[in-house]
């Protein structure tokens, strides 16, 4: 928890899929990555370990281009280009795994297991003038894991039927608006408003149906566990260069945390 990972300046609470096998960042959507292993600037806060600062692609204002790839486990597509040539550009990247589809034909009909994840990156970049730019960026990623098991036992004197299952989801949602303005060759200003949400939900259920001597008894157990974080933030930064040998960074920020732990059992 002492490693800070930023996507366009916004903290990312969960940066991987499949317990660390895949990163949530698709290369086509990224512009640059800066790693601070230590002695990082004060603007990154009070984390004790490292900082990974990731910036997404702004989009091409001149022409359209993109890529599409089909892999053994995942497929992804990327497209960028102008909305208004030389003024507004977009960048969109989508990725999804299909482990759930590939495994389905090989599973027992009474036992169903599934896992998938997806990522969506989108960004719009508008140029008001040579001095002023506005950016809208969005990220949505999710992991989903589930299983269902049905078991039946038949005896001369009784019949038992068991059904249990689990549904687990976790992921990030990030939305940000940023405005850059160049006052002159010495002073640069940047304002950012952002919303960041991490959510984890797990639901489990168990059902037992017994038939003994024509009498029916039903037992049901359900539980829901939810852990969520909502961040609302506003930030303003100034870069001032009074002399080629001096560079001053000033800024202020406000961050409002909302924590949502929840347990429901019935």
Residue map of PLM features:
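N-terminal periplasmic accessory domains that precede
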Residues: 20-26, 35-38, 42-65, 77, ...
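Extracytoplasmic loops and strand-loop junctions of Gram-negative outer membrane beta-barrel proteins
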Residues: 15-16, 35-36, 59-62, 104-108, ...
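Periplasmic-side early beta-strands and strand-to-turn transitions of outer-membrane beta-barrels
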Residues: 61-62, 84-170, 200, 204
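Face-selective signature of the C-terminal outer-membrane beta-barrel domain
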Residues: 125-143, 166-266
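Short acidic/polar hinge/loop motifs at secondary-structure boundaries
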Residues: 10-37, 122
């Amino acid at each position: 928890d002492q490693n800070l990972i930023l996507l366009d300046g916004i903290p990312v609470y969960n940066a991987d899929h499949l317990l660390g096998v895949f990163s949530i960042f698709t290369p086509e959507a990224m512009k640059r990555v800066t790693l601070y292993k230590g002695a990082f600037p004060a603007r990154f806060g009070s984390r004790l370990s490292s900082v990974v600062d990731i910036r997404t692609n702004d989009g091409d204002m001149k022409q359209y281009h993109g890529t599409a790839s089909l892999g053994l486990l995942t497929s992804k597509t990327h497209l960028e280009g102008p909305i208004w040539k030389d003024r507004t550009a977009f960048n969109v990247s989508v990725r999804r795994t299909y482990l759930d589809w590939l495994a389905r034909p090989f599973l027992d009909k009474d036992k169903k297991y599934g896992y998938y994840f997806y990522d969506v990156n989108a960004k719009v970049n508008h140029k008001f003038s040579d001095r002023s730019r506005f950016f809208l960026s969005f990220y949505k990623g999710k992991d989903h894991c589930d299983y269902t098991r049905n078991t039946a036992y038949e005896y001369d004197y009784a019949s038992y039927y068991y059904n249990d299952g689990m549904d687990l989801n976790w992921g990030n949602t990030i939305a940000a608006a940023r405005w850059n303005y160049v006052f002159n060759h010495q002073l640069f200003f940047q304002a950012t408003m952002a919303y960041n949400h991490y959510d984890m939900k797990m639901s489990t259920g168990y059902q037992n149906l017994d038939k003994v001597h024509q009498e029916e008894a039903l037992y049901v157990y359900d539980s829901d566990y939810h852990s969520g974080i909502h961040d609302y933030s506003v930030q303003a930064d100034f870069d001032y260069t009074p002399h080629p040998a001096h560079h001053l960074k000033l800024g202020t920020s406000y961050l409002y945390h909302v924590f949502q732990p929840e347990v429901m059992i019935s």
